[in-house]
A protein has these predicted regions:
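Acidic, low-complexity, intrinsically disordered interaction modules
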Residues: 30-155
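Intrinsically disordered, low-complexity regions enriched in serine, threonine, proline
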Residues: 7-10, 17, 60, 164, ...
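Short, charged, intrinsically disordered terminal tails
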Residues: 160, 164-178
Length: 178
């Protein structure tokens, strides 16, 4: 069976409406996302049949609602939104996971580039994370890591919460089939 590649856009499509709204709100509040925000405003204008000027005049919450209502967004926007969301709302979870892996970080941000976690530590780190934080938040975070750097985080594919996201909808894993 061919493995489906998980992308930020696919992850966006699979999020619940409320979760997508929280991610979109963090995206509009990210001061470093101006270029992606401009692209998102044009996308909203196009999809909702608004003038770009109208979208630009909306407050962040209204833009977030409009963006969250789009079933499909480009990988660049979805990826940036997911990063903004985790940095804004889930630094404690990010830090706890990196601590569990023994990876040096600054409040959840990995200090060095090109860090590859020890695959043997991942199951325990995920278990600890799952005991401290809501399942949907953990699942979204782990899948975001895998989307952002599939080579470094390849071992996450073996984690049940992540592996379920990689299967095409409706397909059972080998473990589920018995």
């Amino acid at each position: 069976m061919t493995e489906t590649m998980l992308t930020p856009s696919r992850l966006w499509r699979r999020m619940a409406a409320e979760q997508r709204h929280r991610v979109a709100r963090a995206f509009w509040q990210d001061e470093e996302a101006a270029e992606d925000q401009a692209q998102a405003m044009l996308l909203i204008a196009q999809q909702k049949k608004f003038r770009p000027k109208t979208v630009a005049a909306l407050d962040d919450d209204r833009r977030a609602r409009h963006l969250a209502s789009l079933a499909t967004v480009p990988n660049t926007i979805a990826g940036r939104a997911l990063i903004a969301y985790h940095l804004a709302e889930h630094r404690a979870m990010m830090a706890a996971f990196l601590d569990g892996l023994g990876i040096a970080h600054d409040n959840g941000l990995i200090k060095e580039e090109h860090v590859k976690p020890d695959a043997a530590k991942i199951p325990d780190a995920v278990k600890q994370l799952s005991q401290k934080f809501p399942e949907e938040d953990v699942k979204l975070y782990l899948n975001t890591l895998l989307c952002q750097d599939p080579d470094a985080w390849a071992a996450l594919r073996e984690v049940p919460a992540v592996a379920g996201e990689l299967r095409p909808e409706g397909m059972a894993s080998a473990a589920e089939r018995g």
